[in-house]
Amino acid sequence: MQPVKTKKKLSRADKKQIEAAIARANRTDKKGKSAQDSIPYERMWPDGICRISDSHYTKTIQFQDINYQLSQNEDKTAIFEGWCDFLNYFDSSIHFQLSFLNLAASEETFANSISIPPQRDAFDSIREEYTTMLQNQLARGNNGLIKTKYLTFGIDADSIKAAKPRLERIETDILNNFKRLGVAARTLDGKERLFQLHAVFHMDEQLPFQFEWDWLAPSGLSTKDFIAPSSFEFRTGKQFRMGKKYGAVSFLQILAPELNDRLLADFLDMESSLIVSMHIQSVDQVKAIKTVKRKITDLDRSKIEEQKKAVRAGYDMDIIPSDLATYGSEAKKLLQDLQSRNERMFLLTFLVLNTADNPRQLGNNIFQAGSIAQKYNCQLTRLDFQQEEGLMSCLPLGLNQIEIQRGLTTSSTAIFVPFTTQELFQNGKEALYYGINALSNNLIMVDRKLLKNPNGLILGTPGSGKSFSAKREIANCFLLTSDDVIICDPEAEYAPLVERLHGQVIKISPTSTNYINPMDLNLDYSDDESPLSLKSDFILSLCELIVGGKEGLQPVQKTIIDRCVRLVYQTYLNDPRPENMPVLEDLYNLLREQEEKEAQYIATALEIYVTGSLNVFNHQSNVDINNRIVCYDIKELGKQLKKIGMLVVQDQVWNRVTINRAAHKSTRYYIDEMHLLLKEEQTAAYTVEIWKRFRKWGGIPTGITQNVKDLLSSREVEHIFENSDFVYMLNQAGGDRQILAKQLGISTHQLSYVTHSGEGEGLLFYGSTILPFVDHFPKNTELYRIMTTKPQELKKKEDE
C-alpha cells in the first residue's frame, strides 16, 4: 500500500471540520453504543479496498446504464446472454453484491446544474424565464433522485498484501466484462466509497461530505466518524430510524415459476428514496451437481416408498403425489442445465430498503413496493428483528448479514437485468437543454462540445418543430455560453429571436442596402495553406456557379481566374487596410484586361453581377458582421442569386471561425433548409468541407432539413452523416424513416418514436447514446412568442 501523504499544517477550515467530526463521534446512546459501532467494516484504504472482517476484503465498481428496455428483441437477447456470461465469471471464491441506490438529491445539486446566472444585462429576464422553465420540467420528472448502480466484490485473504493483487485482477476482469456489454464502468477509490456511505446515512440532512485522509492522524478519528449518522434506532422489529429518516428492509420471496425482466426495473422506477441490494454467491459447480443428484436420489427413494404403499393398498402404483412428480421432473431439468447448458448455481439474497420522512409515508412506500412484487407473483416480506442487519446488508460494502437465500440458475439470476434506460444529464457549465427523456421523464442536458465530433443535424417533417428546436438551442447557447452564433436563414424565420438578443440581421436582397463583399479576405483564413490559395478556391467555386454549365469550369478558365485572383489582392496584401479590399468589379476589370478569349467569356458571364441588375455582391461590406449573433436573411434573393448568396455566407462563416479560433472561441453555425445547399455541386462540396474541418477550428455546424434523401444523394454528401455525432430527429416521413434506420442502425421500436410523433417529440442521438425525447416548451413565455413559426400564432402576435 502507498502511504498517505499528510499536510504539514492544517488550515483553520480543516481544523473546524475535524472538531465537528470529533463532536459527532463522541455521541453515544444510553447503552454506551455509538452509531459508528453499527457500521460493519474495519478499515477503508485510499485505493478503495475495504476490510470487512479479519479476512474479508472488498472493492466497489460503479457502472452506468445502457438502453435495454428500448432495445429490440434480438438486442435484448444479446444483452441478456452477455449478462449470463458475466455472472458465470464469478466462481465460489468471490462473493458479489449488486446495489441500486435511488437517493434524493438536494435541490441545490440540480438547481446549480440548470440555473442560468444573471449577468445584469438586457437578457436577464429571458435567463430567469428559461431557468423557471427548466425548474418546472425538472419538477415533472423524477430528477429529484440521483440513481447510481454498483457492483461490490469481495474475497477472503490472510492480509491486505495477499488480497490486493487478487482484487486488482478480478477488478480488471469485471471492467473488461462490462466493456464487452457496452457498459461504462469505473472503480471507486476509498473517498468515493465513503462518500456513498455518507449519502446513505445522511438521507435526512443531505449534508455535504467533508473528509480528507490527512485529517485522520491529527484527529485520532476513524473513517466511520466522518460518515456516521447522528443516531440509529432499532427499537421496533419492523422498522428503524436513521437520524430523522424512517426506514424498513424487506426481502423478496421468489414464488413465481417464471420471472420477468421488468421486476427490478419497476422497483427502480419508484419515485421515493430506496436501495435494492442483491447479494449473489456462486456455488461450486461440482458441489451443486452433487447436491442436485442427492436431491434426485431422495425424491426417487420417496417415489419408491409411495409406489410400495400403493401396491400394498391395492391401487395403481403410477398414482403418486403430484408434488413428488413435479419436484422430480424439475430436479432432473436442473441437473441437465448444470451439466450441459452452461448454467451455474447461485444463492441470491434480494433486499429492498424503503425510506420516508414519517411512518405513514414509509407504510405507503412499502405497500407500493409490495404491489410491484405481487404483480410478478413474488412477495416482499419485512425482516423481523433483523432491521439493523438488513440495513447494513443494503450498504455497498459486500457484506450479507441476512441468511435468507434462494437457489437460482444463471439464467434465472440474470433475469434481474440491471439495465433499463440511459440518462443524459451532464453537470457541465455549458450543458444545454434538449427536452425530457420519454422513458424516465428526466431532463436531458448535454454539451455537444464534449463529443468527439460536435457537428449536428436536426431532421424532421414540416411542422415537427425543427426550426423551433434550433432556435431553442441558439437561445440557450446565447444565454449560457460565450459562443458566437451565425445563422443562414433562407426563409426569414430567425429575425425576431436575433433582434431580441440584440444580434445583427443582415438582409441580403437586390433591393437591400446591406452589402457583403464576397472578396473579403481574412489573413488568418487558413491554417495550413496561404490565405490567398483558399480564397482562390472559394472564388473558383463562385465563378463555377456563375459561369460553369453542366461540365463546370474548364482548366484554362480556372488558370485565368487563379491568375487574376492573385493579381487583384496585390494592393491589399501590400497595405492591408479595409479601403484596399478588392470588390467583384476589380476582378471583372482584370479579366477584361487578359488576352485570352476565355477571360472575356468569364468577364461577360460576371457582368450581370457587376454592372447589371444582380450587382448586390459588388460592394464593400457595410454591415456589422462582428456581432455575437449574426443572421443572414437570404429569403428575397431570387433563384439566380440564392445559390451565390449561400456560398458567400459560407465564406463569411469561414472568416468568422478563423478569427474566433485565434481568440479560442467557439462558433456555432446553423444552416436552415440545408437541402438547398446540397443540390448544387459547389455549395455541397463547401458544406462537406465545413463538416470535415470545422471541429479543429472550434466550429460547431448544425444542419436543419426535412429532406433526408438529399443528405444521401452522393457518397461525398454522406460524409455529413458520418461526421455528425449529434442528431436531433423529429417526426419522419415513411421513406425517410427506412433510410435513417439503415444509416443509423435504429431498431423498429426506436423508429416508433419518430413515426406520427407529435411536435417536439423524437429521438436524440448523442455519440453512441440514443434516447427518445419530448420537448413541450411552455407557450406563455416571451421566448416561445419570438421562436414560434406557426402562422396562426404569428398572426395573433401581430394582432396584439
Which stretches of residues belong to each language-model region?
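Extended, folded cores of ATP/NTP-driven motor/assembly subunits in large transport
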Residues: 1-421
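P-loop NTPase motor domains
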Residues: 66, 73-92, 99, 103, ...
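Hydrophobic anchor at the beta1->P-loop junction of P-loop NTPases
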Residues: 458
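Conserved lysine of the Walker
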Residues: 466
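Hydrophobic positions on the alpha1 helix immediately C-terminal to the Walker A/P-loop
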Residues: 469
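Post-Walker A helix-loop "phosphate-sensing" segment adjacent to the P-loop in P-loop NTPases
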Residues: 476-486
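A short helix-turn-beta junction within AAA+ P-loop NTPase domains corresponding to the substrate/partner-engaging
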Residues: 502-506, 716-729
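Conserved P-loop NTPase
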Residues: 744-799
